Amino acid sequence: MARTVLDSQLQLLDAQLLVMASSTEDALRTSIAALAARDAEAANAVIDGDDDIDHQEREIEGLCVKLLLTQQPVATDLHRVSAVLKIAGDLERIGDQATDIAEIALTLQGELDDELSAHLREMGDRACVILHDATEAFVERDAERARATIGEDAQINALFESVKSDVVRGIQDEGSVASNLVEALMLAKYLERVGDHAQNIAEWVEYALTGRYKGEVLG
């Protein structure tokens, strides 16, 4: 009977995490689309929705604490609960980055250089893909997919270096630091952080499934 209750609570925990992951991915995609279209309504929707993502994280934290206090989870269950807590934290931070991107969508002035714009678009696309892949690895309980996703962040890091070079070139061409170049650099930094958090999620998915974190057996 106790195991049945525990399994039910673990399933509820997984379901809550997937709702949060969906909300976070939607916020990220919407903020990037709002930036591309200079869509103030969509940008404001992302900003207004951040409190909901924060609330979902707190609900997950509460479920985890309740489960640990009232049930008797074995080691594999503890891996799962610990990973869910960590994943929820990374999702909340991605939600914050989506809000930051949406705020820039409201203030960005003028047009960016074509090459710089292309690099930012690719960063946004890659960030969304990595987050989606990490979430799918959790849904499918696929450790191999999680491991494959971990390596994808290197592409975002390389694009971030390209954006920095684009910005330096733009400053040299203009002879001054235009505000839109500063905002472009901030956008790239936010997207780079999204990639880092998505990689963290994939690493915690692998831990939940195998007990291995960054190649080491924990707990």
Task: Tell where the protein language model's regions lie, with residue ranges.
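Cytosolic, long alpha-helical scaffolding segments
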Residues: M1-G219
